[in-house]
Amino acid sequence: MGGGYVLFGSARSGQMIMVALVLMVGSFYAGSIFGNNSPIYISQPSSSNSSSSSPSQSGPSNFANKIELTYRRTSVSIPESGVNVCPLKFNEYIPCHNVTYVQQLLPSLNLSRREELERHCPPLEQRLFCLVPPPKDYKIPIRWPTSRDYVWRSNVNHTHLAEVKGGQNWVHEQGQLWWFPGGGTHFKHGAPEYIQRLGNMTTNETGDLLSAGVEQVLDVGCGVASFAAYLLPLGIKTMSFAPKDGHENQIQFALERGIRAMISAIATKQMPYPAASFDMVHCSRCRVDWHENDGVLMKEVNRLLRPNGYFVYSAPPAYRKDKDFPVIWDKLVNLTSAMCWKLISRKVQTAIWVKEDDEACLRKNAELELITICGVEDVSKASWKVPLRDCVDISENRQQKPSSLTDRLSSYPTSLREKGISEDEFTLDTNFWREQVNQYWELMNVNKTEVRNVMDTNAFIGGFAAAMNSYPLWVMNVVPATMNDTLSGIYQRGLTGAYHDWCEPFSTYPRTYDLLHADHLFTHYKIYGEGCLLEDIMLEMDRIIRPQGFIIIRDEESIVSRVRDLAPKFLWEVEAHELQDKYKKTETVLFCRKKFWAIL
């Protein structure tokens, strides 16, 4: 297919919807929360009336990128015209959660363990190598905090959840918007009421979840993540996840709302998070069979929970006496008792256990052959593509949490010492990123509301995220699985994140991040070869960054030069700025911004 045209579209329809929304929801931010809904359009030159049918009045200009379905080849060569654009039907392309590819694998997967819901990345030759387009009528997302309750319907144009979950107040259609009332399967009257009840249950009616010591939560099968959204006023950070399954596009809704979430499933492999990272694991009708397979999934929860952490279970076995629910409940009681958990509350459709810090109990139960204790070798490596373990460990990090999040952000996590990172290096990193983040905001020159979903693609010890903590945004701290395992230290700072290998695409929908930060990421991967090339990682960055989103790149001079040359071919604008590194040496930092384009 041939080249196309650039046409500048009118924002008038978006402005009309903006006015309607302001009338509906009251005194929000008078337009600044809606962004600029004026994309450039790519159309086929064969369309004889492309100029007249366009919403633009400014006329066409040349646009070199071609619309053509292109696959990854052994030798990567980007055309002079720029990276090809995928056809419109691929606007929700998620390489490692591709239903068509997974269907080919079904005969070899353990369906009883729901292995089909996990990551399955196709071989290179079956991966697309073209820019993923936005859907028809895509608009710059509504800004936080309005986005918690309202998002553009055209950005996630799927009605299934509204049809099957409307009675539970997950999401409702309101004209050209989706409205999220804050409900869920077990809290259809609203998450705030449910969260207060959990606080009462964990504190014996004396406080809330925060006073119960809950600061970091893992929400299993999170739906549209309203639970996480309404934990935010308490200052509680939640890692929400759900599979790409029959609950159509639930994670896409969550991310469009500006809530931390990722596609994942608890099935046959460990979750991509370190041991002892969460104060609470929450399951509200999460569709996980915890009682099956000798409770191996419950043992994964045990791995993830900190000592004295809570497991919240809101599901029929906790309260119903019909069908096989009592049998399931008995199995859960036996499993949790074997792991030395204590049932502290059971009422109003919810049961809560606490993982007691009782090594003597675990060793006694191991002697009674009620449980198996993991060997040291089982807990020593990053949780990336590691099979689930049918055992429990007793060597989780028991570092005492500082009294406040501010203290945690600046306190040296002792786990970093085991990774060869000194307290002086920690302090240097923390102070450096405070300075850099201030300069980043000046150089980006955007309203703080324009950046909500942020990813640090090579987070090291979380200094960048710690420096960003005072802004109205969240950061997904990614620690590459092939690098020093510092993610447990990041969690000890009160931050969150995940392991990942950038030789593969990330488990998220297209257009989900406003800012990607890459500090010497490309340098690390330049020795890994096919699938990990600079061009591969740039393509994945383009897939997951939102239109008008920023990509900040710091790296070796040769890599910075290469990215600067390639950026226009990915339809990125690029600026270079001279900043100082940690050791006061000047380095070139690239500020790339993805153009807002669409297929006409």
From Swiss-Prot:
Q: Keywords, A to Z?
A: Glycoprotein, Golgi apparatus, Membrane, Methyltransferase, Signal-anchor, Transferase, Transmembrane, Transmembrane helix
Annotated transmembrane regions = 16-36
Q: Which domain of life is it from?
A: Eukaryota
The record, for InterPro entries, names:
Put_SAM_MeTrfase (IPR004159), SAM-dependent_MTases_sf (IPR029063)
- Molecular-function GO terms, alphabetical: methyltransferase activity
**Broad class of enzyme this protein falls into:** transferase
Q: Where is carbohydrate linked to this protein?
A: N49, N98, N110, N157, N200, N204, N334, N447, N484
Protein name (record): Probable methyltransferase PMT7
Q: Which organism is it from?
A: Arabidopsis thaliana
